[in-house]
Amino acid sequence: MSAPLLKLGAVLSTMAMISNWMSQTLPSLVGLNTTRLSAPDTLTQISPKEGWQVYSSAQDPDGRCICTVVAPEQNLCSRDAKSRQLRQLLEKVQNMSQSIEVLNLRTQRDFQYVLKMETQMKGLKAKFRQIEDDRKTLMTKHFQELKEKMDELLPLIPVLEQYKTDAKLITQFKEEIRNLSSVLTGIQEEIGAYDYEELHQRVLSLETRLRDCMKKLTCGKLMKITGPITVKTSGTRFGAWMTDPLASEKNNRVWYMDSYTNNKIVREYKSIADFVSGAESRTYNLPFKWAGTNHVVYNGSLYFNKYQSNIIIKYSFDLGRVLAQRSLEYAGFHNVYPYTWGGFSDIDLMADEIGLWAVYATNQNAGNIVISQLNQDTLEVMKSWSTGYPKRSAGESFMICGTLYVTNSHLTGAKVYYSYSTKTSTYEYTDIPFHNQYFHISMLDYNARDRALYAWNNGHQVLFNVTLFHIIKTEDDT
C-alpha cells in the first residue's frame, strides 16, 4: 500500500479511538475510578493521584490504538481544581481535534493525489505495454539487420581500445613536443640567425666539394659481386634484357630480346616498373635475325650480331632503321668459338665507361679471346688486344673501365676467374664469387650508369650489384 493510503488509515483509526474515549470515559469523571490497562501480554495497576492522566499504549484485537483517560481520586474539596484540569484537558482535546482536522484535509488531498497518480500510472503502464509491443515488432522486423550492424561494429572494440592507448601516447607526445619546442627555442636564441646562415653556406660548400670529388673518381677495380635481385621471370631459358648506359636520368627504357636465335622482335618498356608489370610500350621488328644473347644498347642504338655471320649491326630505335653494319674480321661465328653454354655466343658486344667493345675469338689467336674497341658510329675496330684465355672455357664476360672480367663457368659455383686490363695490357687470375641462383647464365653485361650487372639466368631477369675499388685523383696527380 502507498504511503498516502497508510497515512489515511492511521488518521481514521485515531478518530475512532478518540470517539470511543469520549463516549466511555468522560461520563465517569465525577467519581473515583481504578482501571487496568491491557497491554500485550501484561496487566498494569494504575492509581491516579495527581490529576487526569491520558494513556494510549493499549491496542484492541483489530490493532487499533485505545486511549484511556484515568481520573484522579475523587475529592469533593478539590472540585475546582478538577474543573480546571478538565478545562485544560478539553483544550488539549480541542487542539488535537483541530490538528486531526488539518491532518484529515491533508490526507484527503493526498488521497486524491494518489488516485490521480494511480490513473496516470495505469495510463503509463498501458503506454509502456504499447511501446513494448511495438519494440518487439520492431526487433522482429529489424533484428537481423541490427545483428549485422553489431557484427560490423564488434571489430571496432579492439580498435577503440588501441585508440585509447594511442590517445595516451599522443598526449605524452604533445607534452614532449612542447618540451622539445622550448629546448629548440632556447637553442635558436643561443645560436642566432647568423649561425644558421653560416651553417647553410658550409653545407653548400661541402656539396660542391663532394661533386668535385666524384668527378675525380677514376675507373675502379672490381672487388665484389652481390645479389642477385630477381626483377622478373619470363621468356625462354636464353635471352637478353638491357638499358642504355648513356641515357638521361629520366630515360629508363628497357629492351627485351627473348631467345638466342631465329628471332628479330625487340620489345620496349618505358621503365623497369613497366617491364615488371608487362606494360609494353613499343615493338621493333628488326630487318635481320640476331645470333646469341650478347647484344648491347648504347646511346640510343642497338648493336647485335647478325645471324649466321660475323657482321655487327647498328640499329637506331628512334629512327627505326639500320645506321651501320660491318664485318668483324676473322671473328668466329655460328658456334665456332662460343662461351661454354653455346647458343651462338661467338661475338659478345658490350659497353662500359670508356666506350663500345667486341669480345670474340679468332683462328689467328688460337681460339683465345680477342678484345676490340669499336667506333660507335662506323663500327670500325679502333684497337685490339689478344689474351691467352680460351673463349670456349669462359662462361660469360663483361667490361668495366676497360678491363675484361671473365667467369669460369655459366653453371652453379661460377666465379670471376680472370681479368685483362686494356690500359696496361696485362692479365691476372682473380677469385670473385657470385651467386648463380638459377643455375644457368646466358647473358651477363655491365651497365656503367647503374653500376650493376644485368643477367639472364634460366628464364629469370636478374641484377647483381658490384663493388669497385676507386682511386681519387688529387691536384698533385694531374
UniProtKB/Swiss-Prot annotation:
SMART domains cross-referenced by the UniProt entry: OLF (SM00284)
Compartments reported by the entry: Secreted; Synapse
Tissue expression as described in the entry: Expressed in the brain (at protein level).
InterPro entries, per database record: Noelin_dom (IPR022082), Olfac-like_dom (IPR003112), Olfactomedin-like_domain (IPR050605), Quino_amine_DH_bsu (IPR011044)
GO CC aspect terms: AMPA glutamate receptor complex; extracellular space; Golgi apparatus; synapse
Signal sequence segment: 1-23
Keywords annotated in UniProt: Coiled coil, Disulfide bond, Glycoprotein, Secreted, Signal, Synapse
An individual GO BP term: eye photoreceptor cell development
Entry superkingdom: Eukaryota
Glycosylation sites: 33, 95, 179, 299, 465
Disulfide pattern: 219-401
Coiled-coil intervals: 77-217
Boundaries of every Olfactomedin-like domain copy: 218-470
UniProt cross-references to Pfam families, sorted A to Z: Noelin-1 (PF12308), OLF (PF02191)
Alphabetical list of PROSITE patterns matching this protein: OLF
Subunit-structure text: Peripherally associated with AMPAR complex. AMPAR complex consists of an inner core made of 4 pore-forming GluA/GRIA proteins (GRIA1, GRIA2, GRIA3 and GRIA4) and 4 major auxiliary subunits arranged in a twofold symmetry. One of the two pairs of distinct binding sites is occupied either by CNIH2, CNIH3 or CACNG2, CACNG3. The other harbors CACNG2, CACNG3, CACNG4, CACNG8 or GSG1L. This inner core of AMPAR complex is complemented by outer core constituents binding directly to the GluA/GRIA proteins at sites distinct from the interaction sites of the inner core constituents.
Protein name: Noelin-3
Record organism: Mus musculus
Phylogenetic lineage: Eukaryota, Metazoa, Chordata, Craniata, Vertebrata
